[in-house]
Amino acid sequence: MDIVGGQNLRQMWDDLAEVYGNKTALIFESSEGVVRQFSYASLNEEINRTANLFLASGIQKGDNVALHLDNCPEFFFCWFGLAKIGAIMVPINARLLREESAWILQNSRAQLIVTSAEFYPMYRQILLEDDTLLNHICLIGENAPVEDNVSHFSQLKDQQPATLCYAPPLSTDDTAEILFTSGTTSRPKGVVITHYNLRFAGYYSSWQCALREDDVYLTVMPAFHIDCQCTAAMAAFSAGSTFVLIEKYSARAFWGQVRKYRATVTECIPMMIRTLMVQPASPEERQHCLREVMFYLNLSVQEKDAFIARFGVRLLTSYGMTETIVGIIGDRPGDKRRWPSIGRPGFCYEADIRDEQNRSLPAGEIGEICIKGVPGKTIFKEYYARPEATAKALEANGWLHTGDSGYRDEEGFFYFVDRRCNMIKRGGENVSCIELENIISAHPKIQDIVVIGIHDSIRDEAIKAFVVLNEGETLTEEEFFAFCEQNMAKFKVPSFLEIRNDLPRNCSGKIIKKNLK
């Protein structure tokens, strides 16, 4: 089923501007409460100006451009502006530190980055000292320094015409984005996402929550994540709805924002639900227009029931990952919901439960959740410059191995059991155990290290590190946590430390993590 045809992202925005004109497309609220608003026509003009900015900066079709931004309208100007000229967005998690960000720049081969003044010192240091191709920094915000290799985004953009200066030939098979995501290996892999992927995501996700043009979709999720991009933004724009982007999540402010913008659809992760539940009760907390709350794993039955009863909402479960682009298993519009099932496969997808020999398992038996789609169309195209990793995860016939375990019942409802090996889910972020272990093992006093996820009532999982010290060494908690804070993003820093004489291992030398829980 081809529901996209030949419509690339450039054609999408030109059509949206023509069809919806002055209808509100994007509302952005900053952490200070400052609101910026754009119609479909004015947003398309901002996108065109940004595309022209990139053209004037020497960016051509096929070039990779990095974005390191918190939620802001400029993220969307850049995302779609790059797509209009056939260039490729490489979003970087705004919480990453220097070493992690430099690694993504190096492996994406991006020569230009758009970032905010907050992150300028880090990228100036990367430009001068690290082995990357980065040669230009474009800064968003006031007081950009007057230095070589630095430009001011708003000044340059506002000088550009509102119509596109050059429109290279585009195909829906062209790459629009490379999104680096944590994996079970020590480093992130770049998920290659095409124009077709993003157009399909818009149609699919708008179908999933039955979006209409009179809907208002509000999200607090970070724009550099796949769920904000494909479950929320692309869905809202494809349906002609209004998309409300909040700069940062605040449990105290959330329901006021939902009421203020008369949001009809939003999305939540467990950390949000738990922090909302501990807020003081308010007589206004049920006075909202929400008809659907898109929900992503994992929540107990008691937590789910309490949240629904208190706030008068219903949860629409959706299961997916960056590689699947959208929530390929979930509750369908008008379908019955069978908690704790994650739902059934959506249109254009097949799902199966496989054993270790890649054989299909019958209902009730636990195995690996596998998804069948079309690479570059309904699922990701490949891992960037990683053919071996691509071949391991993605079969030639389109079956994707998620690494997650689950089962299905006799009626075809699927159930999630456990996360992929060596991953920790922390407040909406995926954290690779191996990546943390490699960083921590560089400490001169540490001989052996393993990290695990342990239950956290607020943020899904906390991170606990078990270390074995070199003989004769001592290590304080202050020393350990200071080392971690200097070498990894804040959300990756372990919450707990246990120093042991040894770590449990099996006969092949692998650490037995279950013995540590």
UniProtKB/Swiss-Prot annotation:
Gene: caiC
Catalysed transformations (reactions): 4-(trimethylamino)butanoate + ATP + CoA = 4-(trimethylamino)butanoyl-CoA + AMP + diphosphate; crotonobetaine + ATP + CoA = crotonobetainyl-CoA + AMP + diphosphate; (R)-carnitine + ATP + CoA = (R)-carnitinyl-CoA + AMP + diphosphate
Keyword Ligase: yes
Protein's name in the database: Crotonobetaine/carnitine--CoA ligase
Keyword presence, Ligase: yes
Entry similarity comment: Belongs to the ATP-dependent AMP-binding enzyme family.
Enzyme category, top tier: ligase
Single biological process term from Gene Ontology: carnitine metabolic process
UniProt keyword annotations, A-Z: Ligase
Domain of life: Bacteria
Taxonomic lineage from the root: Bacteria, Pseudomonadati, Pseudomonadota, Gammaproteobacteria, Enterobacterales
Organism, scientific name: Citrobacter koseri (strain ATCC BAA-895 / CDC 4225-83 / SGSC4696)
Function of the protein: Catalyzes the transfer of CoA to carnitine, generating the initial carnitinyl-CoA needed for the CaiB reaction cycle. Also has activity toward crotonobetaine and gamma-butyrobetaine.
GO molecular function terms listed in the Swiss-Prot or TrEMBL record: carnitine-CoA ligase activity; crotonobetaine-CoA ligase activity; medium-chain fatty acid-CoA ligase activity
Biochemical pathway: Amine and polyamine metabolism; carnitine metabolism
